[in-house]
């Protein structure tokens, strides 16, 4: 019992299947048994009520024929017998006719005529008590009251014979008396007793006053009682159901036209149940046999359904836990066999998808590591560029300071030339000083040329580094394109996996969640790659800007070198001219003018060089700022690459729980 209760509580598809099959088996047989039972009941009920009505009509017809025959005789005698016959000499003839009639009709106990003068003529003559007055009898009074109509007395027991008789009387045509006969009802009573309705049903007759005339168990003359009397005496004929002594019965009845008596037939309703029970018992036996045979078939069918279902459930549980190597073995070509094959195909598809995802994840992880390494190298290169730019900026500042020094020297030279013009007496001394100053200026110019060449070399190196950075940025862009492709492929594979899982229904729901997570990781990888690509594009644009600025600085430096060369040539000329002053005093004024003009040109050139140096310093500062921004971008790229690597590791951890090889 405990195992059965445990089986009932355990959720299983077999229980609703058993209930459904039993319902399909039991309901039709049960309904058929019920309707067969009801049909047999109704048919038997109709047969019994029809039998009751037929017997009642037959009994009434027998009574009616007998009464009509006797009424005809009474009518005949009431027409032929008159006062003259009763009082005349033909009394003997009348008695002879009475004798003849009673002889021919055994059911007539006596026939007699009574006159107004209280004389009675009867056959057979059994003697009349002295002082007997026939005119005081009910049969006489009723006949006189009805005037020409035959009347029937209440049935009574004949004292002489003990038979139940009824007196039929009618007033003579001339009104001089009444003719009457005693009708023995034994034949009617016997016919009533012979009637059987069903097994225990019977017929009975009552008078208009509810007194029994004929009944198998109740004494004649007993007044009937019960609810049935109200229905019987409220209509001329019909049928109804009633309760008698606590038992259900049915009755059919009719009313005799001549007497108003009630002829009825009744039977117990329980007879219907007794007669219908074999049909019900047969139906129950058929139902039990059907349940046994159907139960065996149902168990076989349910086992054929649940056995492959259990295999499917067990395999689905293993697949949901990550074991994709499990294979369902259902040896059947029906829908379950097809479902098993489809399940195996789904498992194979999942193994293929997981394998591709694992390979893609490994590629993403490898690419992420390469991207991280490239980002680290780029960061180092950017740091070197930043240091080189800072060194270049320091050299440029030193060059600016030296240019200011040169400008100061040129100012002093201009003052010296002015003094030469003012004081010819000190020309020699001034010439010597000018020669020294020219020599010093030449050295400064040569030094400036050296610094400008150094700046030019630094700019070229910076330009080469920036170009290399641009090339590496392009390489990073290519790597990002590869990552984007891998992310798109991973996303596509995740979508395919989700589709396959959706086809699998409930069994693929767990894998659908995994596929959705894989797809989200792929989308995040693609988004991160796009962000990195955007940062790389910004770096490329900034590198291009830096490259353009380096090219501009390189061009300006080259122009500065040309101007410096010109300045060196001018100082050389000054130096040569100052050495010739002592010998060429006559050309002093012209030389002074030339020196003044040359010094002005040199001063202008130095100012130009100073302006160029300042512009170069500003450009270098911009390049330094761009390099710092690039360094920050590379750090972001490195961080994104690390995030992508972490996501790849998470995806690897997720896919590792799936077993795709035996």
From Swiss-Prot:
Glutamate methyl ester (Glu), modified sites: 370, 629, 636
CDD domains: HAMP (cd06225), MCP_signal (cd11386), PDC1_HK_sensor (cd18773), PDC2_MCP_like (cd12912)
Main location as per UniProt: membrane
Membrane topology recorded in Swiss-Prot or TrEMBL: Multi-pass membrane protein
Transmembrane region(s): 17-37, 282-302
Domain named Methyl-accepting transducer: residues: 374-610
Pfam families listed in its UniProt record: dCache_1 (PF02743), HAMP (PF00672), MCPsignal (PF00015)
Cytoplasmic side: 1-16, 303-662
Subcellular location: Cell membrane
Taxonomic superkingdom: Bacteria
Family as reported in the entry's similarity comment: Belongs to the methyl-accepting chemotaxis (MCP) protein family.
Record-given protein name: Methyl-accepting chemotaxis protein TlpB
């Amino acid at each position: 019992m405990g195992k059965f209760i445990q089986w009932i509580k355990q959720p299983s598809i077999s229980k609703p299947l058993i209930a459904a099959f039993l319902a399909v088996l039991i309901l039709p047989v049960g309904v058929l048994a019920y309707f067969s039972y009801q049909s047999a009941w109704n048919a038997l009920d109709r047969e019994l009520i029809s039998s009751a009505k037929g017997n009642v009509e037959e009994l009434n017809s027998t009574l009616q024929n007998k009464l009509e025959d006797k009424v005809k005789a009474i009518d005949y005698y009431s027409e032929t017998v008159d006062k003259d016959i009763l009082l005349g000499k033909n009394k003997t003839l009348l008695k002879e006719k009475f004798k003849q009639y009673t002889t021919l009709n055994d059911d007539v106990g006596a026939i007699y005529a009574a006159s107004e003068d209280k004389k009675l003529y009867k056959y057979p003559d059994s003697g009349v008590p002295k002082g007997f007055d026939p005119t005081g009898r009910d049969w006489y009074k009723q006949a006189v009251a009805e005037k020409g109509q035959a009347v029937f007395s209440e049935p009574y027991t004949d004292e002489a014979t003990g038979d139940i008789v009824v007196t039929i009387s009618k007033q003579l045509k001339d009104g001089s008396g009444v003719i009457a006969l005693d009708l023995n009802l034994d034949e009617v009573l016997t016919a009533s007793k012979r009637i059987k309705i069903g097994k225990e049903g019977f017929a009975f007759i009552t008078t208009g006053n509810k007194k029994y005339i004929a009944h198998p168990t109740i004494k004649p003359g007993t007044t009937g009682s019960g609810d049935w009397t109200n229905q019987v005496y409220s209509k001329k004929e019909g049928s109804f159901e009633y309760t008698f002594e606590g038992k259900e019965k049915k009755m059919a009845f009719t009313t005799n036209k001549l007497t108003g008596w009630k002829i009825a037939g009744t039977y117990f309703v329980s007879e219907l149940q007794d007669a219908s029970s074999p049909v019900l018992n047969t139906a129950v036996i058929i139902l039990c046999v059907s349940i046994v045979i159907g139960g065996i078939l149902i168990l076989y069918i349910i086992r054929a359904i649940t056995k492959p279902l259990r295999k499917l459930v067990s395999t689905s549980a293993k697949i949901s836990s990550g074991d994709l190597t499990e294979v369902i073995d259902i040896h059947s070509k029906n829908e379950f066999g097809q479902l098993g094959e489809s399940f195996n195909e789904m498992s194979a598809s999942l193994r293929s998808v997981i394998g591709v995802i694992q390979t893609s994840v490994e590629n993403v992880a490898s690419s992420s590591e390469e991207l991280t390494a490239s980002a680290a190298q780029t960061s180092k290169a950017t740091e070197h560029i930043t240091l080189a730019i800072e060194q270049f900026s320091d050299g440029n500042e030193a060059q600016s300071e030296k240019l200011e020094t040169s400008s100061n020297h040129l100012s002093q030279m201009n003052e010296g030339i002015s003094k030469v013009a003012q004081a010819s007496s000190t020309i020699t001394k001034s010439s010597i000083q000018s020669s020294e100053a020219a020599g010093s200026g030449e050295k400064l110019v040569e030094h400036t040329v050296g610094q400008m060449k150094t700046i030019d070399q630094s700019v070229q190196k910076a330009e080469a580094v920036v170009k290399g950075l641009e090339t590496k940025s392009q390489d990073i862009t290519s790597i990002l394109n590869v990552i984007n492709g891998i992310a798109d492929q991973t996303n596509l594979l995740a979508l395919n996996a989700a589709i396959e899982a959706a086809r699998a229904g409930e069994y693929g729901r767990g894998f659908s969640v995994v596929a959705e997570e894989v797809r989200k990781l792929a989308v995040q990888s693609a988004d991160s790659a796009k962000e990195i690509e955007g940062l790389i594009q910004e770096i490329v644009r900034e590198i291009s800007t830096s490259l353009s600025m380096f090219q501009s600085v390189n061009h300006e430096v080259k122009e500065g070198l040309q101007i410096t060369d010109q300045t060196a040539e001018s100082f050389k000329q000054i130096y040569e001219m100052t050495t010739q002053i002592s010998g060429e005093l006559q050309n002093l004024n012209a030389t002074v003018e030339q020196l003044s003009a040359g010094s002005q040109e040199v001063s202008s050139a130095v100012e130009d060089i100073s302006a160029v140096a300042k512009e170069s310093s500003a450009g270098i500062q911009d390049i330094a700022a761009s390099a710092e921004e690039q360094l920050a971008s590379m750090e972001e790229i490195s961080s994104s690459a690390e995030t992508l690597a972490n996501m790849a590791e998470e995806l690897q951890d997720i896919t590792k729980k799936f077993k795709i090889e035996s």
